[in-house]
Amino acid sequence: MTYLTRRTALQAIAATGTSFIGITEALANALSLATSASSNDDEFWFTVRQAYAIDPTIVNLNNGGVAPSPRSVQDALRRATERANEIPAYEMWRNQEPQIETVRQRLATMFGVDQEEIAITRNASEALETVQLGYRLRAGDEVVTTTQDYPRMLTTWEQRERRDGIVVKRVKYPTPLVNSDDFVDAVVSAITPQTKVVHISHIVFLTGQILPVQSICRIARERGILSIVDGAHSFAHIPFRRADLDCDVFATSLHKWLSAPIGTGMLYVRKDLIPSIWPLMAAPKTMDADIRKFEEIGTHPAAVHNAIGDAITFHQ
């Protein structure tokens, strides 16, 4: 994964084939701007801005919670939804549902993993809770996380604390974090022989602090501890792949920085760990080692997850 460049962004916009600025000729002009040494950032980003249908009367400074989808993604979602409503069962299950495999492969390529390690979810919370609630823990087992992790995820661990008698340790660290070694030392010092899980954010949701997750994950691996990384705010935002984190589990919301449809997320689980995690909703025993067991949620709109592919095209 790389940072957005002028050329790749505009090529992606042009490739969508939509009329978001009314004239296709304007796209060709924009492409020439991208390669011109005299073009300035304002011209380029104005063109990118036209790809989005945004209320001009409001300056939206919060794209971290839910980002808008470009018109190309909205159009793809709309067309597929309309088609699914014309012949629902046939279109949804025979035509649209199988396309999730193409999306799975493209996400796996972006993250640098095997497609059999990627599940498509509705958001990062669902993806993380799948593992938080599905991983086998006994009374007395410890989970190490931080006070600055996402509240919903902390609430999930607290529920397991009440329900199963596990122990949740919340590491405090300063904001801003000046020395990454201080963070690593703080987390490692909380680890004991009873620690079974370490759960940390890649980018802190409130501050934007990027944490040294690779160091933590490698230490966890050496000690036989499951490492969970909350990447809700990092995927498609900063350049990295799974190898840069070395985590066992990674989850993100695709409706944030990737600009995929609202209600899309991704879960990565290292292949050999899949059998050890129960899905949130029941799946047959034959799927015990299949990443798709985490997608067994009943009837859902296939058009939504298929439009993730259009978001990837735009992003790249």
What are these regions (language model features)?
Residues 2, 8-316:
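Pyridoxal 5′-phosphate
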